[in-house]
Amino acid sequence: MNKALLPLLLCCFIFPASGKDAGWQWYNEKINPKEKENKPVPAAPRQEPDIMQKLAALQTATKRALYEAILYPGVDNFVKYFRLQNYWAQQAGLFTMSARKAMLAHPELDYNLQYSHYNGTVRNQLAADQAQQRQAIAKLAEHYGIMFFYRGQDPIDGQLAQVINGFRDTYGLSVIPVSVDGVINPLLPDSRTDQGQAQRLGVKYFPAMMLVDPKQGSVRPLSYGFISQDDLAKQFLNVSEDFKPNF
């Protein structure tokens, strides 16, 4: 081969190799990027009305139906009202049944376990209550002296003196009666006249029963005003337990 043609041949092989693949350029169309699809925004879920709003709406609808049935009597108006009324009755029945079912699942919530509401158990329940009251009276009597401040000329105080007398006999309780006006009630012949005890103990309202701790020099009110014997026994229990609720 002519040495003069060799460089020319090399150039023919080199230039096509360094260029782009022109043979496919007619097919390589410019691809436009796809536009981002706008997906529809899902509709917000429908919110249920607040329970208080729902209750108020039902109550208003029931009242309105009742008033319409009264002011504009007719079959349609009455049926509209009565259907709403039956709805309330049905819901009340479901509530009652769910409560009974709940008491079986959670007996600790059943009030009937502590205080039976059946008439047949009243006698036993009263006996248990009275036993607690007796224990409370005995407990307080061990730590406190019991003083009864009264006015001998007041008829209500005189009526309470009868209760105090009966209470002392029933429970064997020692009570010190004190007349603040100097008039001794004949039902309480062991009464003392007030020599400043009421003022020292801070008793300003009468009649009054006070618990006095001679060791500590403290005083606790037990009752003011007239009170029956049964309620006085309950009051001893309440004071001894610092008025702890029994429900």
UniProtKB/Swiss-Prot annotation:
This protein's GO CC annotations: periplasmic space
Alphabetical keyword list: Conjugation, Periplasm, Plasmid, Signal
Domain of life: Bacteria
InterPro entries: TraF (IPR014110), TraF/TrbB (IPR039555)
Function: Involved in F pilus assembly.
Major subcellular location class: periplasm
Record flagged with keyword Signal: yes
Pfam family, one: TraF
Location in the cell: Periplasm
Residues of the signal peptide: 1-19
Protein name: Protein TraF
